[in-house]
Amino acid sequence: MSSFKKLKKYAIILKEVKNQRGKLAMVKIDLITGFLGSGKTTFIKKYAKYLLDKGMNIGILENDFGAVNVDMLLLRDLMGDNCELEMISGGCDKETHRRRFRTKLIAMGMCGYDRVIVEPSGIYDVDEFFDVLHDEPLDKWYEIGNVITIVDAKLEPELSEEADYLLASEAANAGSIILSRAEEATKEQIENTIEHLNRALEQVQCKRRLDQEIMRKDGAELSEEDFDKILKNGYVAENYRKMELDEKKGFDSLYFMELKISADELKTQVAKMMQDPECGGIFRVKGFVKDDAGSWMQLNATGHEISMKPIGDGQEVVIVIGEQLKADCIRKYLEN
């Protein structure tokens, strides 16, 4: 089939989709952001359950940084008649990713959802979300509901310029900001995190300063009344100075498949690796490994903690995410 005929066929299909979609009510769409390891997926499980308990039919769109989506596996227990999971893999250029995102939203727009939740990676250009939703026909199908940002209550006091930019860009438009692990943080750590957020906003010339929008509660402590409030908080349209992260080439993700390493040894090696400056600036390590009994274990490592917990299903992959990563050095810890 010629390129012209393919385009003509696509135009006919899209026109029919628009006609069918026009008969349905607009779908609310939420964006839930958070820097690497902040606890987005944990929060989404609780938020999705809250929406399901209200009788809503929801779709969750997972978008990971890189070609393998680990978080998709962590949300599988939500799947059912009223909750479906979709995925966009990263590992592609900006324009390709935007096209995939738009195409996926067009498909999901025909599913009759009451609400769609978008969970991007911890390294995400928030402008993509708003820009795509202003494209035709999505601007007539979707209505932006909430922008929710998850921030670790024990946020590192010093981050790179690029990392601070991501932090600010994710917080600038948020209607609600949730401090994850707040129950583990001291009052001083929480106040330092809020100061860091506002300092990051100032650095990108954003006039917004955060205080009342911040819920100083961990996701596990949020009540139904708290979620009622979050559901109504919406988002804020703020301006700030943009940074082209692609030009910086600072953030990387490395994948290690089918490692011949025990769960205990993996946890030990990851702890050493994250302390080794020769490996680069590692923000997050996540993935799955089998224990001695053949059961799946979930690895989750940040600068604050390293956990290894049982999980029903997994995939033999470990993902390392950070800045200026040195693959050869990291490989020595994981493969030797």
What are these regions (language model features)?
Residues 3-18, 22-23:
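Short, positively charged and aromatic/hydrophobic N-terminal segments
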Residues 27-33, 38, 42-160:
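Nucleotide-state-sensitive switch-loop elements of NTP-binding domains
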Residues 59-61, 286-289, 320:
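Short, hydrophobic beta-strand segments that form beta-sheet elements in well-ordered domains
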Residues 76-80, 170, 204-208:
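Short, conserved catalytic or adaptor-binding loops enriched in Gly and charged residues
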Residues 123-124, 130-145, 150-205:
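Conserved C-terminal guanine-recognition region of P-loop GTPase G domains, centered on the G4
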Residues 173-179, 184-312, 324-327, 335:
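C-terminal accessory "lid"/substrate-recognition subdomains
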Residues 313-321:
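C-terminal engagement modules used by replication, chromatin/transcription, nuclear envelope/ESCRT
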